[in-house]
Amino acid sequence: MTAYKPYRHQLRRSLFASTIFPVFLVIIIGLVSFYAIYIWIEHRTIHQHVDESQSSLHHTEKQIQTFITQHNNSFQELDLTNHHDVTATKRELLKLIHQQPATLYYELSGPNQFITNNYEHLNTKNMYLFSTHQLKFNNSTYMLKIYMANTPRLSEIKKDSRQFALIVDQYDNILYANDDRFTIGEKYRPQQFGFMNESVKLNHADHRLIIYKDIHENIEDGITLLIVMAVVLVLLVIFGFISADNMAKRQTKDIETIIQKIYYAKNRHLGTYTPLKNNSELEEINNYIYDLFESNEQLIHSIEHTERRLRDIQLKEIERQFQPHFLFNTMQTIQYLITLSPKLAQTVVQQLSQMLRYSLRTNSHTVELNEELNYIEQYVAIQNIRFDDMIKLHIESSEEARHQTIGKMMLQPLIENAIKHGRDTESLDITIRLTLARQNLHVLVCDNGIGMSSSRLQYVRQSLNNDVFDTKHLGLNHLHNKAMIQYGSHARLHIFSKRNQGTLICYKIPLSRGNVDV
């Protein structure tokens, strides 16, 4: 049966296209939109936080620089070898540190002196060297280093937004980090996936502040949600298809039955009338199918009978045209022999009568190949009387081939054509070779006559396709058309010839119309 899409299949597709798929699409669009908005908001937040942190650090740096500038002269009057001056220096530096919002530590180092507020002996290598300054105390130069451990704003950003801060130098060496996943002193290598970050320049030393956020957890949550949605979608699709199939089966059972009957009617296997299970309007279609099938069957039988009659008429007409053509040539021979050899003329008349009895037999259009060969031998014998035994006939055939059944008068035109167009002043040798192969009889008729030029050969080949009742050339054209009527396109007739080298005709006759070699 030809493949088609039943109504229930279309119902499944409609259910998916109109309900399940749009809902799933809306959810996907919503989820993608949510993540797009989330990424956009996070980018804006990171941008805002990096600007705020930069501003805060710049403000602290400016206050420290202002303090150093204002107290530079007073520091020069102090002598750090004096205990009271050391205490005054510590007091001023602590005042500077405590005025800043960041957690800062200082180290003042010089000749035989080291002052710091790092009383807990924290490792300053884990802190950011915020700034360095040279201070002069009583003609002695000291180095002031200020370290940043943290700032309230960075801590707030880390706590509230889970955004972490890094400070790196121009070579991407990490100088500060409030995330344990990074080690100070190592190279900063930005992650390509699962991280969002933004950086800004901090100072003239090309230090950069980086605020970043790890969104792996959010992505994993989104993937988990997508998996859950996919599972739910699959379950919905399965449930929807099963429901639609059950509903469609109940509602379209009669439709499928009618489609099946149409298929059977197309292949002429409908059978007797069978009503539908459900009494509905579809019963009218069912009745119409059977009525149309019966009408078509009657019409087909009528056409087949007409075609058979037409083939019989055409075959008889072709055979009728063969007889005058042959009789004319033979009667000329008899007329010639009556004067020279009445006894031989009597023999020719007897042979001619046997041939006419064979050709006018109307009870069947088929004969054994052996009968056709006997007819050809009598035909050549008559022609030899006319042409002084110039024709030599050789038949090569197996016994099995001789007992095959073929159409009557299917070989004689080949011999007639060889004698008529191949004979010259010298003798003419004609060889008939008969072979069986793959349900076909292969006939090869070869002569050593004058042959044909290439233009004449092309003309003869083209004339084979002319209408049998229109052409004036009877022989091969009649034979070819008769074969087409009796055997259809399975029969083949090929002509090969060269000038002064003879002619070869290859003729294939199907022995079984049901299994032929095309």
Curated annotation (Swiss-Prot):
The chain crosses the membrane at residues 20-40, 222-242. The modification Phosphohistidine is found at residue 325. GO terms for cellular component: plasma membrane. It is a multi-pass membrane protein. It is an enzyme of class 2 (transferase). GO terms for molecular function: ATP binding; phosphorelay sensor kinase activity. It catalyses: ATP + protein L-histidine = ADP + protein N-phospho-L-histidine. Keywords: ATP-binding, Cell membrane, Kinase, Membrane, Nucleotide-binding, Phosphoprotein, Transferase, Transmembrane, Transmembrane helix, Two-component regulatory system. Residues 297-513 form the Histidine kinase domain. Its main location: membrane. Its EC number is 2.7.13.3. It is found in: Cell membrane. The keyword Zinc-finger does not apply. This is Sensor protein kinase HptS. The lineage of its organism: Bacteria, Bacillati, Bacillota, Bacilli, Bacillales. The gene is hptS.
